[in-house]
Amino acid sequence: MTKYIFVTGGVVSSLGKGITAASLGRLLKNRGLNVTIQKFDPYINVDPGTMSPYQHGEVFVTDDGAETDLDLGHYERFIDINLNKYSNVTTGKIYSSVLQKERRGEYLGGTVQVIPHITNEIKERVYRSGRETNADVVITEIGGTVGDIESLPFLEAIRQIKSDIGRDNVMYIHCTLIPYLKAAGEMKTKPTQHSVKELRSLGIQPNIIVVRTEMPVSQDMKDKLALFCDIDTKAVIEARDADTLYAVPLSLQEQNMDQIVCDHLKLDNPAADMTEWTALVEKVRNLSKKTKIALVGKYVELQDAYISVVEALRHAGYSFDTDVEVKWVNAEHVTAENVQELVGDTDGILVPGGFGDRGVEGKIVAIQYARENKVPFLGICLGMQLASIEFARNVLGLEGANSSEINPDTPYAIIDLLPEQKDVEDLGGTLRLGLYPCKLSEETNAYNAYNEPVVYERHRHRYEFNNQFRPDMEKAGFVFSGTSPDGRLVEIIELKDHPWFVAAQFHPELVSRPNRPQPLFHDFVKASLTNKESK
């Protein structure tokens, strides 16, 4: 029978519930269990697709085109699985589904209520995740903090699941904070006690408490928490700030967290073999080289907006025993006069995805700098589109060339709406989303990176290169090295007379893994190291 683990949070948000859930998933997978994982977000948006990155961080796209929470990126990178649309559920999705059923008459004229209709819909999403993946274990993270009004239906639903399928098949893990008061020189357990009290008042008794802390937790403190929270002392797990995220699974294993889980759920799988993971962490801690990459974006104040890009750069660096330092460059501040000052000390330049016109001209200036000064360049989504516009303006001399997204009246729409997007009015869920094939041309940097004729990558865009300009740009040295199999859509571009200048319409960062870097990122970091050594 499938086992269910629920991860909740208390005291404050951003405690690392997602990393805790992902780390436990990795440990259970290494015990030979088939693990899947999902995130429940209590906000009323259907998905984060139309939310500002300042509100929510990056939007992580799954193979099947779901726009999801950034925690799914952590899940995929840690557990090394590809998740699907069932892995992220929001209050908006739940209510939307229930209202559609009500309109269809599926409730037989009954009064639709939070209990049982909303809670039943939530439970069905939990069970469906296990059914769709044939999982041995389903880990579900509940977003937000215990005590939030928005979380109550989710907490009630997961409380009911224990009654539905039996206590041996359900486990609750609660993540809290033990603050350290520097002035008093003390750590305080009271916030955790109150958080657990709140959770218990809702009918949920946690089986494990994971305490986030910047200082070591003494045995006396663990005993105190165990007494007041009514759990075994061994089930108080310390989650101290780590030097690398990838060390967290090892820390949890040292404290026997996965064994406690298996004992409670009556799973007799052998201990997790973490030899390869330990070697990875040792490598990360002992990188001998450095390279600096300029990330030119418009959301640089909130680095979570580009979290998968940064992780993909790090993964690529691990292959070369290299610590990749990211220099955050606000695209709105970049001008032709100061670009040398802002990016001149870096070994490579990366322009990530985005929407809208803010910061676009600064990104184009940075791209021009990379092209003219032979600096390794990687463009992603909007970065690829702007690389095309920069070339059209400054090499072909098409003054005013632009994207019709940014300037609908441009005389040269190098980037234009996909044909199927012309009549679309809604913003949410209407982009070209998910995994699509890309055919590569031989003897190109893209082909050399992948070493395969056809690759599959995840997309999230509405605009595309305008094929009207392909012949003239090809004559001028612009290479269309990746296209859709029918040749209609441009997927990858690069430059002939440049050491390494590649840009992709898709989002390669979404499939990178710590032990298996994404090929374009791998070769971009390699080119950046070569550039550094040649200076």
Swiss-Prot record:
Keyword S-adenosyl-L-methionine: no
UniProt entry keywords in alphabetical sequence: ATP-binding, Glutamine amidotransferase, Ligase, Magnesium, Metal-binding, Nucleotide-binding, Pyrimidine biosynthesis
Pfam families, alphabetized: CTP_synth_N, GATase
Pathway terms, separated by semicolons: Pyrimidine metabolism; CTP biosynthesis via de novo pathway; CTP from UDP: step 2/2
Record SUPFAM superfamilies: Class I glutamine amidotransferase-like, P-loop containing nucleoside triphosphate hydrolases
Active site: 381 (nucleophile), 507, 509
Cellular component GO terms held in the UniProt record: cytosol
Binding site for UTP: 13, 188-193, 224
Residues bound to ATP: 14-19, 71, 240-242
Positions that bind Mg(2+): 71, 141
Activity control summary: Allosterically activated by GTP, when glutamine is the substrate; GTP has no effect on the reaction when ammonia is the substrate. The allosteric effector GTP functions by stabilizing the protein conformation that binds the tetrahedral intermediate(s) formed during glutamine hydrolysis. Inhibited by the product CTP, via allosteric rather than competitive inhibition.
Gene Ontology molecular function terms on file: ATP binding; CTP synthase activity; glutaminase activity; identical protein binding; metal ion binding
Family, per entry: Belongs to the CTP synthase family.
HAMAP family: PyrG
Assembly mode: Homotetramer.
Note: CTPSs have evolved a hybrid strategy for distinguishing between UTP and CTP. The overlapping regions of the product feedback inhibitory and substrate sites recognize a common feature in both compounds, the triphosphate moiety. To differentiate isosteric substrate and product pyrimidine rings, an additional pocket far from the expected kinase/ligase catalytic site, specifically recognizes the cytosine and ribose portions of the product inhibitor.
Its biological purpose: Catalyzes the ATP-dependent amination of UTP to CTP with either L-glutamine or ammonia as the source of nitrogen. Regulates intracellular CTP levels through interactions with the four ribonucleotide triphosphates.
Official protein name in the record: CTP synthase
